[in-house]
Each structure stands twice: as structure tokens, then as C-alpha cells.
Amino acid sequence: RVITGPKHITKFGMFNYCWIGCLTVIYDMSVVGLIQIADIKKNNDYAMWLKVIQKADCYLLNENLASYRVRTGSISRLKKTSLIQWHYKLFREVEKEPVIVAVFNTMRNLIFGVIKKWYYEKNV
């Protein structure tokens, strides 16, 4: 299957969902600067993109550059309830948002995760 995303991602769009994967990412350090990844077990890539998007919008390169395999027992295979907890933790602890905002962003992320599956995943 091939997973794509929106062609242009703004700060608002990035808080909706982490559209960017870290497998094949390039960013211009002269524009964005040095970005340190948050020291959290899960979603550290998302935490990084939330920092990047503060300085520049993101754009989709509409090419398949890599393959990604998920194996049994990997951190990427967590249960859905566990993923919800990690998203909440990201918004609450890393982004330092109030509880209600962290809950809202977590729920918003779930909704856009479903939209991504319906609209941006294609079986090849």
C-alpha cells in the first residue's frame, strides 16, 4: 500500500495529524535551524514536526522514495488505546498545552487519522 498526504501542510494541519513520516525527510536547516527531538518514547518525530512547522510550512514530494515494514512487537504496533495515551502525552507534556486543549488535539488527531486511512492510503 502507498500512503500519501496533503500537498501543503500548515501549522493548523500539522496539529490535525502528523502527516509527515520520518523515513525520507529532508528539511532546509538554514530556514528551520537545528531542531532537537523531544526525549519521549513515542511520537518524538511528531514532536519534532510540531517544532519545524512553527518556522516553515511543509510540502509533499509526490514520489515513493522508500518502503517501510512494521514488525510484530515493534513500538509502531502499539494498541489503539496506547496510541491515544501517547498522543495526549505529546500535547500535554511536550507542547505544554492545558488539559482541555490536549484532549481536543488528541481527539482531532483520531478523526484525521481515520480521514488519512480513507483518503490517503491506496492499495497497490
For the regions a language model picked out, list residue spans one by one.
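Conserved nucleotide-sugar donor-binding catalytic segment
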Residues: 1-82
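Non-catalytic, C-terminal membrane-associated alpha-helical segments of glycosyltransferases
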Residues: 59, 65, 73, 77-124
